[in-house]
Regions:
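Sec/Tat signal peptide C-region and signal peptidase I cleavage site
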Residues: 16-17, 31-37
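Short helix-onset patch at the extreme N-terminus, typifying the N->h transition
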Residues: 7, 24-25, 42-45
Length: 185
């Protein structure tokens, strides 16, 4: 039986090479189709450096002269946190006519305009002197310590407090220091 069918001139190695070439062409077209399906875009990265926040002390806190009534168990004096502070004593204390220096502590905060910041005060301030230590519970003229605003890049605030005086507080000058911190929110 003759299976030649007139195709005796076929070179089988050439067909194999053509199949390989055809396969590689399809693979290359597949990659090029993927490259046409891709897209890209660029983005811009930015950073803004703002003015550092800072605080400066303008005035120290001073409760002025206070007298302890000898027949009462001591008491408290509250100093309002304002530019013109008011002192309010409880029954056990009196405020003499010679007031001495009376002022709330004053601070100026500077930083980036329209920024919001936090003021941190201590829970208690200790005053030491010739007798037992006295404690001040501080208060601030800024109603919300966690969201004060630097409207124009500067803000002044005041710190007052409530001073607790013992019944037998020894006469003399008492003093203490306290820290005030500010940070951007």
């Amino acid at each position: 039986m003759n299976l030649d069918h007139g195709c005796s001139n076929i070179n089988y190695p050439e067909i194999t090479q053509m199949k390989k070439l055809y396969f590689l062409t399809l693979v290359a077209l597949g990659f090029s189709a993927n490259s046409f399906a891709q897209s890209f875009v660029t983005a811009t990265s930015t950073a803004t450096i703002i003015t550092p926040i800072s605080i400066a002390k303008n005035l120290d806190m001073n409760f002025g002269n206070i007298a302890v009534n000898p027949t009462t168990p001591g008491g408290t004096v509250t100093l309002s946190a304002s530019a013109s502070p008011v002192r309010t004593p409880t029954v056990g204390l009196t405020l003499p006519a010679v007031t001495g220096l009376v002022q709330a502590a004053s601070f100026t905060v500077t930083g980036e305009g329209s920024s919001v910041y936090t003021i941190t005060l201590p829970n208690s301030i200790s005053l030491t002197g010739p007798g037992a230590a006295m404690a001040i519970t501080p208060n601030c003229s800024v109603s919300t310590l966690t969201s004060a605003a630097l409207t124009s890049g500067t803000q002044v605030f005041y710190v007052g407090g409530t001073l607790t005086v013992a019944a037998v507080q020894v006469a003399g000058a008492y003093s203490g220091t306290f820290s005030v911190n500010v940070n951007y929110n």
